[in-house]
């Protein structure tokens, strides 16, 4: 199981960061939990009203993240892809990962990849931030996005 070596999430002060979250609706219980975790971290960091956009599946996430990256300081991508019996899993995971990376680099905007790519539904549930989950990948993605946005801001305005 994942979770070993996870760093402590820093206390973030991101009150003036504009944040967007794009989350799929496929595997609703898991995606809703990921979204809840991301929203909690955002609120703790002072981001009270992030833009939230829901899409059907993971493959739609990168293009919506691209639109959001044009108008926000950070974007969080949330979803889940569970391996099936065909190569479709590999194609979707690769397309989503490459798409999100490209959006982040092209827009110079952090896009945190909180899209779970797992072999089983139980693995996804264990990472979704539910009461019995070992991890909260939605919360971790939010911390990564906000932390990176603040780092980029510091780099852009040297002391």
From Swiss-Prot:
Pfam families recorded: DMRL_synthase
Binding site for 5-amino-6-(D-ribitylamino)uracil: 26, 58-60, 80-82, 113
Keywords carried by this UniProt record: Riboflavin biosynthesis, Transferase
Biological process according to GO: riboflavin biosynthetic process
Catalytic EC class: transferase
Binding locations of (2S)-2-hydroxy-3-oxobutyl phosphate: 85-86, 127
InterPro entries documented for this protein: LS, LS/RS, LS/RS_sf
Gene Ontology annotations for the cellular component aspect, listed alphabetically: cytosol; riboflavin synthase complex
Active site per the UniProt annotation: 88 (proton donor)
EC nos: 2.5.1.78
GO molecular-function terms, A-Z: 6,7-dimethyl-8-ribityllumazine synthase activity
Known pathway: Cofactor biosynthesis; riboflavin biosynthesis; riboflavin from 2-hydroxy-3-oxobutyl phosphate and 5-amino-6-(D-ribitylamino)uracil: step 1/2
Catalytic activity reported: (2S)-2-hydroxy-3-oxobutyl phosphate + 5-amino-6-(D-ribitylamino)uracil = 6,7-dimethyl-8-(1-D-ribityl)lumazine + phosphate + 2 H2O + H(+)
Family label: Belongs to the DMRL synthase family.
Assembly: Homopentamer.
Classification via HAMAP family: Lumazine_synth
Function: Catalyzes the formation of 6,7-dimethyl-8-ribityllumazine by condensation of 5-amino-6-(D-ribitylamino)uracil with 3,4-dihydroxy-2-butanone 4-phosphate. This is the penultimate step in the biosynthesis of riboflavin.
Name the UniProt record assigns to this protein: 6,7-dimethyl-8-ribityllumazine synthase
Gene this protein is translated from: ribH
